[in-house]
């Protein structure tokens, strides 16, 4: 076995072991959290204007994202905090958005803000934007102040493109949009959890094959995969616990940061197609309703209900049918995203892989 191959195998083995450890630890934490949430009546409130079939979920424990976030943070700090800058960024974003989501969940549960059932949309938006701006600066700034990505992006059929300072506002938009998109998708049992598992898994493979220098990020992705898989144990239909804003906002923002760090964020709409379509369906529904109300005096709708998974429920699909079909779409999209990343990968990364391989071959020849 060549030296390069041995290193790659070792990196993948470490990532898979972290995924397995995350799965086991999340199962343990999850069992405790479900019991704790039921005991203290941390049950979710269900929108009365949603599908009537969802009313049976009233009182189901929420804030289940804590089992994922806590596991990922602990395992990353203990076993994957080697390159501090590259790992502190996704960890910092995950924790920041988790705190915001946890407070919002708590206010919703306690009724402290009975009129809004949590933070106002505008307040959450500006907090999320502020955190996303700091993360974008950290990605753009040169070392030792940042990760020195300098606005580089890999575009299929084009190659490596430097978009300069435009990277910062684009990165902010991606982080805020994907965070909210995952939150919107988290409306059916295991729907968000499955698609997060697929998306992080896809970027784990991409960073392993297309960007070997980001092996710590690969290990981080697989840690999240293991934790999300264990969460599905409790979130499978009928769910024992919901992810809540704590999990959805934090994992969505973290997924966006991982995509940005890998320089393959242009593929995020493909890999995370379910999240993107769910969010767009809500924006289209809201925008069209407001426009028709202004234009015709009455609000009209494009879909029976937004987001899109509710539309299909009202068409007669059962919740498991909607989830399984959306997951199948997400699976194919993840495979397509990985394929595009490999076909149109970074020339720089290919050079970095080929050079060690040449060195190994020359060494073998000397022996």
UniProtKB/Swiss-Prot annotation:
The chain crosses the membrane at residues 16-36, 62-82, 87-107, 125-145, 158-178, 190-210, 214-234, 240-260, 264-284, 326-346. Pfam families: Glycos_transf_4. It comes from the Bacteria. Pathway: Cell wall biogenesis; peptidoglycan biosynthesis. Its cofactor is Mg(2+). It catalyses: UDP-N-acetyl-alpha-D-muramoyl-L-alanyl-gamma-D-glutamyl-meso-2,6-diaminopimeloyl-D-alanyl-D-alanine + di-trans,octa-cis-undecaprenyl phosphate = di-trans,octa-cis-undecaprenyl diphospho-N-acetyl-alpha-D-muramoyl-L-alanyl-D-glutamyl-meso-2,6-diaminopimeloyl-D-alanyl-D-alanine + UMP. Its EC number is 2.7.8.13. One of its GO terms (molecular function) is UDP-N-acetylmuramoyl-L-alanyl-D-glutamyl-meso-2,6-diaminopimelyl-D-alanyl-D-alanine:undecaprenyl-phosphate transferase activity. Keywords: Cell cycle, Cell division, Cell membrane, Cell shape, Cell wall biogenesis/degradation, Magnesium, Membrane, Metal-binding, Peptidoglycan synthesis, Transferase, Transmembrane, Transmembrane helix. This is Phospho-N-acetylmuramoyl-pentapeptide-transferase. One of its GO terms (cellular component) is plasma membrane. InterPro entries: Glycosyl_transferase_4 (IPR000715), PNAcMuramoyl-5peptid_Trfase (IPR003524), PNAcMuramoyl-5peptid_Trfase_CS (IPR018480). It is a multi-pass membrane protein. The keyword 4Fe-4S does not apply. Catalyzes the initial step of the lipid cycle reactions in the biosynthesis of the cell wall peptidoglycan: transfers peptidoglycan precursor phospho-MurNAc-pentapeptide from UDP-MurNAc-pentapeptide onto the lipid carrier undecaprenyl phosphate, yielding undecaprenyl-pyrophosphoryl-MurNAc-pentapeptide, known as lipid I. It comes from Chloroflexus aggregans (strain MD-66 / DSM 9485). Belongs to the glycosyltransferase 4 family. MraY subfamily. It is found in: Cell membrane.
């Amino acid at each position: 076995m060549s030296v390069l191959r041995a290193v790659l195998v070792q990196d993948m083995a470490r990532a898979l072991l972290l995924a397995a450890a995350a799965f086991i630890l999340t199962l343990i934490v999850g069992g405790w959290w479900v019991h704790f949430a039921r005991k203290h009546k941390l049950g979710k409130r269900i929108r009365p204007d949603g599908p009537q079939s969802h009313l049976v979920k009233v009182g189901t424990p929420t804030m289940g994202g804590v089992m994922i976030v806590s596991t990922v943070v602990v395992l990353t700090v203990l076993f994957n905090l080697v390159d501090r800058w590259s790992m502190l960024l996704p960890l910092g974003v995950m924790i920041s958005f988790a705190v915001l989501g946890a407070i919002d969940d708590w206010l919703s549960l306690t009724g402290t803000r009975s009129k809004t059932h949590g933070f106002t949309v505008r307040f959450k938006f500006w907090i999320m934007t502020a955190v996303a701006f700091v993360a974008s600066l950290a990605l753009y700034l040169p070392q030792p102040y940042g990760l020195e990505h300098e606005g580089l992006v890999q575009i299929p059929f084009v190659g490596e493109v430097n978009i300069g300072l435009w990277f910062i506002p684009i990165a902010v938009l991606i982080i805020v949009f994907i965070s909210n998109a995952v939150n919107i998708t988290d409306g059916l049992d295991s729907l968000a959890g499955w698609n997060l598992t697929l998306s992080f898994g896809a970027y784990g493979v991409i960073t392993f094959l297309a960007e070997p220098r980001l092996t710590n990020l690969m290990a981080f992705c697989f840690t999240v995969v293991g934790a999300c898989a264990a969460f599905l144990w409790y979130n499978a239909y009928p769910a024992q616990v919901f992810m809540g804003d704590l999990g959805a906002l934090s994992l969505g923002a973290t997924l966006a940061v991982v995509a940005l760090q890998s320089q393959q964020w242009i593929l995020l709409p493909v890999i995370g197609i379910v999240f993107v379509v769910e969010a767009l369906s809500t924006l289209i529904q809201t925008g069209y309703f407001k426009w028709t109300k202004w234009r015709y005096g009455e609000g009209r709708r494009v879909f029976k209900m937004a987001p899109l998974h509710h539309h299909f429920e009202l068409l007669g699909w059962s919740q498991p049918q909607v989830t399984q079909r959306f997951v199948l779409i997400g699976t194919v999209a993840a495979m397509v995203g990985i394929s595009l990343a490999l076909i149109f990968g970074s020339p720089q990364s290919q050079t970095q892989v080929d050079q060690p391989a040449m060195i190994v071959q020359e060494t073998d020849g000397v022996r």
